[in-house]
Design a protein with these regions (language model features):
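Short secondary-structure transition hinges
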Residues: 90, 96-136, 145-150, 168-170
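Amphipathic alpha-helical packing segments from all-alpha helical-bundle domains
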Residues: 71-75, 118-143, 153-157, 161, ...
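Hydrophobic alpha-helical connector segments
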Residues: 61, 75-101, 155-159
Length: 220
């Protein structure tokens, strides 16, 4: 018979995850000890190990729970059955909202995945690919010509480049908030998407041939 968890276990666990994410984001995963996490959370180190067996498991939970929320956004938007543009706009808005509420967790996800154990890293990277594939599929539905030209993945990654790193420079204020930035990101993306020609890869390939083929795509 499984041992019952004490009342408040999940609340304490979520608090530990939040405080650990803050420390990892501020100091870096490698520079933060479990002693510091325990002190930050106001618990003893033995008590901390009651919730997480080691620091790597703590990191894995932070990354996977953040990704789970992002995957939930994708599934909720897909369930609405929207046309490609409104679906992409809604995903952008929801992603920006999630990032605004989880800036520490997002920084940890983007900067500390390399410290994960192999199995955990594989799961996290597959979770990221799921999200990228979903957005890329919507872009492909909107511009099938660009899909045939091999441009959908690069364009999708350019979009993620706009929103994934906002935490490094954008500070929400009274005049410009995360909510206000989301449609700006969408307008920039769709304005640029309409200007992209399906022959662009041919031009890049031609230039690569001229310099000995030293240029590589995103996947190389």
């Amino acid at each position: 018979m499984a041992r019952r968890r004490a009342p408040g276990f999940e609340i304490q666990r979520e608090q530990i995850l939040a405080e650990a994410a803050l420390l990892f984001a501020q100091r870096g995963y490698a520079s933060t000890s479990m002693n510091e996490v325990a002190e930050r959370c106001g618990v003893s180190k033995p008590a901390l190990y009651h919730y997480f067996k080691d620091k790597n498991e703590l990191l894995a939970f932070i990354c996977e729970e953040h990704l789970a929320r992002l995957k939930a956004v994708v599934l909720e938007v897909e369930a609405l059955g929207l046309d490609p543009e409104p679906a992409i706009r809604l995903m952008i808005r929801r992603f920006v909202e999630e990032y605004a509420d989880a800036q520490n967790e997002h920084r940890v996800l983007t900067e500390d995945v390399k410290f994960l154990a192999s199995e955990d890293r594989t799961r996290v990277l597959e979770g990221e690919r799921f999200i990228v594939r979903a957005l890329a599929a919507a872009v492909a539905r909107m511009r099938p010509d660009l899909d045939a030209a091999g441009l959908v993945k690069p364009l999708t990654m350019l979009l993620f480049g706009m929103i994934n790193w906002m935490f490094t420079w954008f500070k929400s204020g009274r005049r410009v908030t995360h909510a206000a930035m989301a449609p700006i990101v969408a307008d920039l993306f769709f304005g640029g998407l309409g200007a992209v020609a399906e022959t662009a890869p041919l031009a890049l390939e031609s230039e690569g041939d001229k310099d000995g083929g030293t240029r590589r795509g995103l996947d190389h």
